[in-house]
Design a protein with these regions (language model features):
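Glycine-rich beta-strand-centered segment in the early N-terminal region that forms part
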Residues: 10-27, 41-93
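Extended, non-globular alpha-helical segments
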Residues: 24, 105-142
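Local beta-strand N-terminus motif with an aromatic residue
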Residues: 83, 98, 113, 191, ...
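A structural motif shared across PLP-dependent enzymes of the aminotransferase-like
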Residues: 92-107
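Mid-domain Rossmann-like dinucleotide-binding core that forms the NAD(H)/NADP(H) cofactor-binding site
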Residues: 125-198
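Glycine-rich cofactor phosphate-binding loops and adjacent beta1-alpha1 units
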Residues: 175, 189-227
Length: 227
């Protein structure tokens, strides 16, 4: 925080295929912390440094998840109108910590924007956008669907809660792992079985899953074997 500062910049003007969002809430994600502190895993350090900046972030304004209202639209915009409440993941374009952010209407490498669920506020929408984008990406890549078995590790967090719901929605059998205090929450999301972190031995030896979704990066990979 001590290296961050407030600064006045010009308000961006949306291009023909962009919407201008008045940011009402922005999330601070693990990715933001890694980018700001250059805390990048060793195997990804060189390509990520080249992409994001060698000695400091190439983008002066970081932040990759936001929620707000559409302030203006380009002439080719069809899905959104001024006043719409939206949430967005900015991708490598970053910029969510600004007061205004231009986003392309259609999903791209520079992020994606969507209408906010009507029953949540701006702060909650940033969580849905971040967790939802990550969970959706990996579950689609794993082709999770009817008849597949999924283990969600970290099922009560931002990504895990959405992963459980998406996997169930697509017809998978979901086994979830969470802390003791969140077991009922995770069960209410539709998990078929819920295991406690404190008693992971309850998972039967040799248990098989089509896909393991590790939302916290702490799963004991020595116990996992690709089959």
């Amino acid at each position: 925080p001590e290296v961050m500062k407030l600064e006045e910049i010009d308000r961006p003007v949306p291009k023909d295929d962009e919407v201008l969002i008045r940011v009402r809430a922005a999330g601070v994600t693990a990715s933001d912390i890694f980018i700001r502190g250059s805390q990048i895993p060793l195997r990804m350090r060189i390509p990520m440094r080249l992409m994001l900046g060698i000695t400091r972030p190439r983008k002066g304004i970081i932040g990759e998840v936001l929620a707000g209202e559409v302030e203006a639209i380009g002439r080719n915009i069809q899905r959104f109108k001024v006043g719409d409440k939206v949430c967005a993941v900015t991708g490598f374009s970053l910029g969510a910590y600004a007061e205004y952010k231009c986003m392309k209407e259609l999903d791209s490498k520079q992020g994606c924007v969507a209408h906010m669920p009507a029953n949540i506020g701006f702060e909650a929408a940033t969580v849905v956008a971040y967790g939802g984008a990550l969970a959706l990406q990996f579950l689609e890549r794993a082709r999770v669907g009817q008849g597949r078995s999924v283990l969600v590790y970290g099922a009560s967090g931002t990504c895990g809660t959405i992963a459980v719901q998406l996997a169930k929605h697509w017809g998978a059998h979901v086994t979830a792992v969470s802390g003791t205090s969140h077991i009922e929450l995770v069960r209410s999301l539709g998990a078929d079985a819920v295991l406690d972190y404190a008693n992971q031995d309850s998972l039967e030896p040799g248990a098989r899953f089509d896909f393991v979704f590790d939302a916290v990066g702490r799963a004991k990979t020595s116990k996992l074997k690709e089959v």
